[in-house]
Curated annotation (Swiss-Prot):
One of its GO terms (cellular component) is t-UTP complex. SMART domains: BP28CT (SM01036). Belongs to the HEATR1/UTP10 family. Involved in nucleolar processing of pre-18S ribosomal RNA. Involved in ribosome biosynthesis. GO terms for molecular function: snoRNA binding. This is U3 small nucleolar RNA-associated protein 10.
Length: 1788
């Protein structure tokens, strides 16, 4: 049974359907928009109509929402109930809901979206049925308020992955991002849920940037956290953790990286993968899988970030080749190598590039993919690989070259391409080339054989092609094997005819090419090579006489063939020379070619060449007796080639002294042999000693020998290699290399472009190197060579060879510096002519002119050359601007006259002018100052040329001006250089500036003016003003930095001499420059904002800030008004100058303002706007602007900062600044006095300026600064200074020790002023200063303050008749009491009487003086507060009397407050006995002074009673007795005529008396109480009944208050009043009001006694019987006019309650009932009311006597008086209510 119950409970808990109406209502109230109470009342149609609006808006925003119109948003959806749907229907609905939520995700911040989701929540309860999807949709927006609202409506059980939200659901706060990241790190299910939601959104193309950013951020941080979490020190555990991590993240990242429709998701996944790779320490297989997946999914949009990710992954992967998939993908990237190079600027790409290169090389040799070679080449050359990687890749290329076979590369194309790449890499420059060459040296397989293989891969096939038809053979023909092919080659070789002629004389190119190919095919095999060597065509047996054999091999090793082939060729010749039959020959013809071989790039070639040279050396060890025949002396070269052969000695020297000693180094370094040869030919002295030097003749012979071979050999490579050495030799024995080699240049230049290119291509040499080497044969100052150069330049055939032309001009440029001056001059003229040559037939730019121009730009031109150019330029410009002569104009029959040169001539002139002026500018004009006159002339002529051309010619003018400007320093530094002032240069510049519209020209001209003003001011000063006027409207407006520089320079250089000129003229300096200042000020609004401040600071600095700063600031404010911007700007300006300058400026500014108010202003009229001096309104307006500026200038930061440092200095500078400060202060004070009558605004500005001025200096420095002012005879000024000091003291910090010391030190001076001055106002100000100083700092120097107090209290101050002075003195003394306290005691015997006298005087005066009155009280209050013992005896009596008089005088509220404040201090602080004695004495005076005096008296007494201790009160009971007896006798004394005032005073007396009673014990107070009762009854004569009654009224008023407040504790004191009360009540009634009041107070007093009796006091028969009969008897008087019926009834009721016994009740009741038979209705009525109250109060207790009452009640029912009868009925009702039964039966 229990199991079934638990199952049912579980089902109920998980069920979403219920019949509980409260639960249903609560579920219906869940809403994103509405409050629960509102939502609970809404119907589904209402909700649908509201939410449908949001859905429709979403449909307008995104048409994808419309597909939900027929499902979630159909009208029928209003009736949907998920609890009634089947599982299949709910599943289908879930799909719609989740799709809709995905689509809403991007617009959750929009209200229409919230409305739409509201419908899903209200109708479909998605927060319960689709909780996970709803939370996932909102989670990226976890910071917005809507998310918190969502949390508030979620069900109690949310999906497990989102349980971390529970605390936030409870607190209804948004979860921070850090919490989500932490949970994603520690809860895999949360990270999976977020990832799956994101992937689904991307899959449906419903993602948005916010979602991707959220997922990416969480994923990255969670991945980082997981990596930290899974990190372990044990390898096995780490592997397990890595596997677990990959299982968790791998599938998500894999899906994300291939989501091509979502680039953002892909990039975000790349970030995560990057974290994993960088921090995860993953295995290579995992990283490779990531790389494969990445490239599988990337798109053009994500390719670049993907590449970056690949780079990062690769850096954490082993250095091995990439997978096939990654390699293929990278090959598809356009320009992948350049892209990697670019990425490499920010990331390391070397491992990725290395892996790619290795993979591509692998594809190359396995699949023959030749497309990869350019990529590998680019990667190797692209600076993306490191040294080791470059070596590995290059080695892999070499290995691939070995491995490639005919199966992969059938036609040899791949090997050809690979060979080209390998060779190009080996010849590359820079670091990569060095690494590759080092790699070649390091490899352990035969590079030469490889090279030969690669080179032979094509050529053998070419060799066997018998005829063109062979190419057309069927492709299916079986391939001939290599051996058969070699045999065919040899068969072909055997059929060739023998050759004898030198290969250098005749060039059978076809034969040579064929022989080369055959040689290459056999070079690797020695036997085949031997067969080749023995071929008839080579004619080896005739080698001693025939030249073909040796020249063939010599030509071969000088060509661009593989290394192995070159070595084989060298070996053939070496072996040849070893034969004895050659011993009689002179083989010096081989030497030049051996030198070429020794400089070959390949070390093996150089080694073979060295062996050859060694063999050659053996021929020249001993001189033969007979001259040997020189091999090749006939027919080695062409017939017209003459070779200068060496004799034996020269040959021996060349070989044994130059070549053989250099062989070892030559083998190591390819350049060594040429350098050794150059060194040997350059000098006869050798570094090694005299024994090895070459003689002059030998060097000359070798020089000619080698030169002749260079000219004779047909091989360009040989010429080029030998020229590397020969071009280093200028001349030997007067014969220059130009003389020997010029024919070489002539030959090369005669070749057409096609012929030259054919030669270059055949030998694979660089054209530029050849051109440069051939042109370099021309040396400087060789007329023939230079003449040939210019002839060639002008040759129409040479013009087509651009490279040669460039080399010719480059040679001219190279040898320029070595030319003589005359040669340079002539060459420069020729170049200028060429540069200006025009070829109208050429459509392209003239190469000759361009090159000539380039040379002239690059060479250093002398002054003479430049002068010549300028003169030629001047002539051309002059011709262009002059009109033709009259005769020429009249030629022809036409009437039309030619007024100018043709446009072509003008254009040529302009072109030449431009070029020449550019040359001048580039030639560092400062080095050619002699050009200045010519340049000014040119500038002048350009002004005329402008008119002819109709153009600005800005560029030309700028060139001239910049050149002139560059010369200025030279003129300034050299006294020998002068500028003629009469030449009119200044006018030329002024004209140039005014007529030009080019900012560049204007700027340059202004800079030149500035420089001239500094260098030769007389040249330009007379032209300055027009220039500045023009500047204001043009240059100042420019925003560029250069214009700013120009203006600054102009200002710096021109203005100082201009100002100096004005000074010499003895005119008003500032007024004289008003026009200049105005031009700058007016231009202010046009000047770019960033330049304004610097410009005007520069202007002011050069004008002289001490004279002009104030003027500029004033003009600014005058022109533009005192706006915030202008005030800020002027403040910045003044803040840029020193303190001294600023203070001088402010003083002058004050003078300027003062000048405004003069009847005939002078300075202000010159600088400021013109106003009518008679119009006060205009003058005030003008002055207001300036006075608004003044305070702002005083608060600039620099002024405040620097002036604050004065205290640390005491030098002349600080003294000067203090003087200026004092002068400025005086000026401000004086100006304030001037403007005060004018207008309040002006005075306010002055006050503000004064405040800012006072705050500038520290108080110590301020005092130092104003000391001189205080010595002035002008008392008004002195007073103003002290007032300024007073204001300054207010602002000082109390904690500033320096301020304290300074002010206290100043006190004696103030005291002297008070003592000695006759001016009351001055004294007043001094006292005020003392007051403020003492208040802040007085406690630190009591002696000084005490001295000041004595002076103030004396006759010179407080004793003066001046009311204001006395007030100030009293207030000051009050402050000093606080400061000095006991130290002021010696002063008080003088001060107190004077103060009290002032107080009495202030009250007695016809018109009371409130200020004096309050000041006196302030002083007395200070005394009472701080030294109360000094107020005693007569002083206190006098003070109290004065206070009474003050109260009676009816002064204002302020006076009353000051008086009461003082009396409060008196009451609290003066010793008790003294105070109470004085109060007792003062009662009569207070009483006679009226109500207010009495009230204050009683307040003082009450306060004293509160503040003094019980002991003090107890000791003075006698005094208190006297005081209170006097008080209780107040009514009798009759001093108060107003009953209301009397009652208030009596109430106050009673309250005050209680304060005393509270502090007394019973023993002390009971005698006082007894004495009081005795005094009230017997204290007056018996005859004074009225007085006695009045005294008793007061007494019983007190007694009532006494018993009412003290209650039961004083009940026993009632025994003292019983007799008196009975006597008063028993007295016969009279009509006296006093007695009526007395009877009433007696009854009330007894009532309070009865009411608070808790001890049975009134139960005692003695007490009860004494009072009860008398009280009841009072009912008999109820009919009288003075009855106190109400008081009587209350008294009787309280007595009955207090008596609390049947006997007493019966006695009272019996007595009362007797009065019911009274004849008087009033008596009966009073008794009935009493009975009513007793019945109500005592209830059944009282009704115990009901039987006795019934007869009387019955009788009263028929009473004659209706009121009595009615009250009787009420009494009956009261009884019935008490008893709970009717009295009718009893009354019957």
């Amino acid at each position: 049974m229990s199991s079934l119950a638990s199952q049912l409970a579980q089902i109920a808990a998980n069920s979403r359907s219920t019949l509980n109406t409260k639960v249903l209502k609560a579920a219906h109230s869940k809403s994103l928009i509405f409050e629960p109470r509102v939502a609970a009342t809404q119907t589904y149609p209402e909700i649908y109509s509201i939410c449908l609006e949001g859905f429709e808006e979403l449909c307008n925003l995104d048409s994808r929402f419309t597909k939900f119109t027929q499902s979630l948003w159909s009208p029928q959806s209003q009736e949907a109930d998920r609890t009634q749907m089947s599982a299949a229907e709910n599943a289908a609905l879930d799909k719609h809901v989740e799709a809709f939520l995905h689509l809403c995700g991007s617009r959750l911040r929009l209200m229409p979206t919230i409305k739409a989701i509201e419908w899903l929540i209200r109708r479909f309860r998605v927060h319960e049925f689709n909780t996970a999807a709803l939370i996932a949709t909102f989670l990226p927006y976890h910071t917005i308020p809507a998310f918190v609202t969502l949390l508030s409506i979620l069900p109690a059980n949310i999906p497990k992955e989102y349980r971390f939200l529970d605390p936030y659901i409870r607190s209804l706060t948004a979860p921070p991002r850090a919490a989500i990241v932490q949970q994603a790190t520690n809860r895999p299910e949360l990270l999976t849920a977020i990832s799956q939601y994101t992937l689904d959104s991307c899959k449906y193309q419903m993602e948005y940037p916010g979602l991707i950013s959220f997922w990416g951020g969480v994923m990255v941080e969670a991945t980082n956290g997981l990596l930290d979490k899974y990190r372990s020190g044990r390898r096995s555990i780490q592997i397990e953790n890595d596997n677990a991590l990959m299982q968790q993240l791998g599938p998500v990242l894999s899906d994300a990286m291939v989501m091509k429709s979502s680039p953002g998701l892909q990039i975000a996944s790349y970030m995560v993968v990057t974290i994993l790779a960088a921090k995860g320490g993953l295995a290579d297989n995992a990283l490779t899988a990531f790389m494969d997946q990445l490239v599988h999914g990337w798109t053009p949009e994500t390719m670049r970030p993907g590449l970056v990710t690949l780079c990062i992954i690769s850096q954490h992967r082993s250095a091995k080749q990439l997978s096939a998939r990654v390699t293929k993908a990278l090959l598809k990237v356009p320009e992948v190598a350049s892209v990697m190079n670019e990425i490499g600027k920010d990331h390391r790409v070397d491992k990725l590039a290395n892996g790619l290169a290795l993979a591509l090389v692998d594809r190359l040799h396995k699949k023959g993919d030749v497309r990869s070679l350019p990529v590998v080449n680019s990667l190797l050359l692209g600076n993306v690989l490191r040294e080791k990687q470059i070596k590995v890749v290059y080695k892999s290329l070499l290995v691939a070259a070995h491995r490639i076979n005919d199966q992969v590369d059938q036609d040899g194309a791949i090997r050809k391409e690979l060979g080209t790449v390998l060779v190009s890499l080996s010849q590359a420059g820079g670091e990569v080339g060095d690494i590759v060459r080092a790699t070649i040296d390091e490899v352990d397989f035969d590079i030469d054989a490889l090279e030969l293989t690669l080179g032979a891969s094509i050529r053998p096939k070419l060799a066997v092609e018998d005829a063109p038809e062979a190419a057309a053979e069927d492709n299916n023909t079986p391939k001939v094997d290599k051996e058969a092919q070699v045999a065919q080659n040899f068969e072909k070789l055997s059929k060739l005819k023998p050759q004898t002629a030198s290969c250098f004389a005749e060039e059978p190119l076809d034969l040579l090419e064929e022989l080369y190919s055959l040689f290459l095919s056999v070079a690797a095999n020695e036997s085949n090579l031997q067969k080749f060597d023995e071929a008839p065509v080579l004619s080896r047996p005739q080698a001693p006489t025939k030249l073909f054999y040796a020249s063939f091999y010599m030509r071969l090793w000088c060509g661009s063939l593989p290394t192995l082939a070159k070595v084989a060729a060298l070996d053939r010749v070496k072996n040849l020379l070893k034969d004895e039959e050659f011993a009689t020959l002179d083989f010096q013809a081989v030497v030049p070619y051996a030198i070429v071989a020794l400089s070959d790039p390949a070390k093996k070639v150089r080694r073979a060449a060295a062996e050859l040279v060694t063999v050659l050396g053996s021929f020249y060890e001993t001189k033969p007796s007979k001259a040997r025949r020189v091999w090749g002396s006939e027919g080695l070269y062409a017939k017209n080639a003459a070779v200068n052969w060496l004799d034996f000695d020269a040959t021996k020297s060349l070989i044994h002294s130059v070549l053989i000693p250099s062989l070892e180094e030559s083998i190591l370094h390819e350049d060594h042999i040429l350098a050794a040869l150059t060194n040997a030919l350059e000098s006869s002295k050798s570094k090694d000693g005299d024994k090895k030097h070459l003689s002059h003749s030998t060097r000359f012979a070798i020089f000619k020998f080698l030169s002749s071979h260079v000219v004779g050999t047909p091989l360009i490579a040989v010429k080029l290699r030998l020229l590397q050495s020969l071009n280093q030799i200028k001349s030997i024995s007067g014969t220059s290399r130009t003389d020997l080699l010029l024919s070489l240049l002539q030959w090369w230049a005669r070749l057409s472009e096609a012929e030259a290119q054919q030669l270059l291509a055949r030998e694979a040499v660089d054209e530029a190197s050849v051109n440069n080497a051939f042109v370099d044969v021309v040396i400087a100052n060789n007329e023939a060579g230079l003449r040939l150069i210019f002839e060639l330049i002008r040759d129409s055939n040479v013009i087509t060879r651009n490279g040669l032309v460039q080399s010719l001009f480059s040679r001219v440029q190279k040898i320029w510096s070595s030319m003589k001056a005359e040669t340079q001059f002539s060459t420069a003229r020729a170049l200028l002519t060429l540069s200006q040559a025009v070829h109208p037939t050429s459509s392209e730019p003239d190469v000759i002119a361009t090159e000539a121009t380039d040379v002239l730009h690059k060479v250093e031109l002398t002054t003479d050359i430049l002068l010549d150019f300028l003169e030629s330029l001047y002539d051309d410009i002059k011709k262009a601007t002059e009109k033709p002569a009259t005769k020429r104009r009249r030629v022809g029959s036409s009437e039309k006259s030619v007024d100018s040169q043709s446009p072509a001539d003008v254009s040529a002139s302009l072109s030449k002018a431009t070029f020449v002026l550019e040359l001048v500018q580039e030639s560092e004009p400062a080095k050619h100052p002699e050009l200045l006159p010519s340049l000014f002339t040119t500038l002048s002529e350009l002004q005329h040329l402008r008119t002819v051309v109709g153009s600005e010619l800005g560029y030309l003018q700028s060139l001239v001006l910049s050149s002139l400007l560059a010369m200025m320093p030279a003129y300034k530094d050299s006294k020998e250089l002068t500028i003629d002032p009469a030449a009119g240069h200044g006018d030329i510049l002024a004209s140039c500036i005014q007529r030009s519209s080019s900012p560049t020209v204007i700027n340059a001209a202004l800079l030149l003016v500035a420089s001239l003003a500094r260098t030769a001011p007389d040249v330009v000063l007379h032209s300055v003003m027009p220039i500045f006027t023009f500047m204001g409207s043009s240059v100042l407006k420019q925003a560029d930095d250069y214009s700013a520089h120009v203006v600054n320079q102009t200002v710096k250089e021109v203005i100082p001499p201009l100002i100096e000129t004005f000074r010499k003229s003895r005119r008003n300096l500032v007024a004289s420059t008003a026009e200049l200042l105005t031009s700058f000020v007016v231009a202010y609004e046009h000047i770019p904002s960033h330049r304004k401040q610097d410009l005007f600071i520069t202007l002011i600095e050069n004008l002289g800030p001490e004279d002009f700063l104030f003027a500029v600031l004033a003009m600014f404010v005058d022109k533009y008004g005192a706006t915030d911007n202008m005030l800020a700007f002027t403040t910045q300006i003044i803040g840029s100058f020193s303190v001294e300058i600023q203070l001088q400026t402010l003083i002058k500014h004050l003078d300027l303002i003062s000048d405004i108010f003069k009847p005939k202003p002078v300075l202000s009229a010159a600088l400021l706007a013109k106003v009518d001096s008679n119009s006060e309104q205009d003058v005030v307006k003008l002055a207001t602007k300036q006075l608004t500026l003044l305070p702002k200038l005083l608060v600039n930061r620099r002024l405040r900062h620097e002036i604050s440092g004065l205290a640390e200095k005491d030098d002349m500078e600080s003294v000067k600044i203090r003087e200026l400060y004092a002068q400025l202060l005086e000026g401000v004070l004086t100006l304030a006095g001037t403007v005060k009558p004018k207008k309040d605004t002006l005075y306010t500005r002055c006050a503000e300026a004064l405040s800012n001025l006072l705050n500038l200096l520290s108080i110590a420095e301020f005092i130092k600064s104003v000391e001189a002012l205080l010595d002035r005879p002008n008392v008004i000024l002195r007073q103003k200074v002290l007032r300024a000091l007073e204001r300054r003291v207010d602002s000082e910090s109390i904690n500033n020790p320096k301020s304290r010391e300074a002010l206290l030190a100043f006190l004696p001076q103030l005291t002297a002023v008070i003592r000695e001055s006759d001016d009351m106002n001055y004294k007043h100000t001094a006292v005020n200063c003392v007051d403020k100083i003492a208040e802040k700092y007085g406690k630190k120097d009591l002696d000084a303050v005490a001295a000041a107090a004595a002076t103030i209290a004396g006759d010179s101050c407080l004793g003066q008749p001046s009311q204001e002075l006395r007030v100030m003195a009293l207030l000051c003394l009050a402050s000093l009491v606080d400061v000095l306290q006991d130290a002021i005691v010696p002063v008080l015997p003088i001060a107190i009487p004077k103060a009290l006298g002032c107080l009495e005087e202030s009250i007695k005066a016809e018109k009371p003086d409130g200020a004096l009155h309050n000041a006196a009280y302030a002083f007395m209050a200070a005394l009472a507060q701080h030294i109360p013992y000094m107020i005693s005896g007569a002083y206190l009596d006098r003070l109290l009397v004065c206070s009474n008089a003050s109260a009676a005088a009816g002064l204002n509220e302020e006076c009353r407050d000051s008086r009461t404040d003082c009396l409060q201090f008196v009451a609290k602080l003066i010793e008790g006995k003294v105070l109470f004695t004085a109060l007792e004495k003062n009662w009569a005076n207070a009483a006679s002074s009226g109500y207010l005096a009495l009230e204050e008296y009683l307040h003082v007494l009450g306060t004293a009673l509160d503040k003094h201790p019980k002991s003090s009160i107890a000791k003075n009971t006698t005094l208190f007795t006297g005081i209170f007896l006097n008080a209780f006798d107040l009514r009798r004394s009759g001093v108060l005529s107003s009953t209301q005032e009397l009652e208030k005073i009596e109430l106050l007396i009673n309250e005050t008396s209680l304060k005393m009673i509270y502090k007394l014990n019973d023993a002390a107070f009971r005698p006082m109480f007894s004495h009081l009762m005795e005094w009230s009854t017997t204290g007056l004569p018996k005859s004074d009944l009225a007085g006695k009654a009045q005294r008793q009224v007061s007494t019983y008023g007190f007694l009532q208050h006494f018993f009412e407040n003290l209650k039961s504790i004083v009940t026993s004191y009632a025994s003292y009043i019983i007799d008196s009360a009975v006597k008063i009540l028993s007295a016969p009634l009279t009509s006296d009001d006093v007695l009526k009041t007395l009877r009433s107070r007696v009854l009330r007093t007894l009532t309070k006694c009865f009411e608070h009796d808790q001890d049975g006091f009134w139960q005692a028969p003695a007490h009860f019987n004494a009072v009860a009969p008398v009280l009841v008897a009072q009912f008999g008087h109820a009919a009288g006019a003075d009855n106190c019926t109400n008081d009587l009834v209350l008294a009787v009721v309280e007595l009955a309650a207090a008596a609390d016994s049947k006997e007493h009740h019966k006695e009272i009741n019996s007595a009362l009932l007797k009065h019911l038979r009274s004849e008087q209705a009033a008596v009966r009525l009073a008794v009935i009311k009493c009975e009513q109250e007793l019945t109500a109060r005592l209830g059944e207790e009282w009704l115990q006597s009901l039987p006795e009452m019934l007869p009387f009640i019955s009788e009263l029912q028929d009473d004659d008086d209706e009121v009595v009868e009615r009250e009787n009925r009420r009494w009956i009702v009261g009884i019935e209510e008490t008893l709970g039964e009717s009295l009718d039966n009893m009354l019957q």
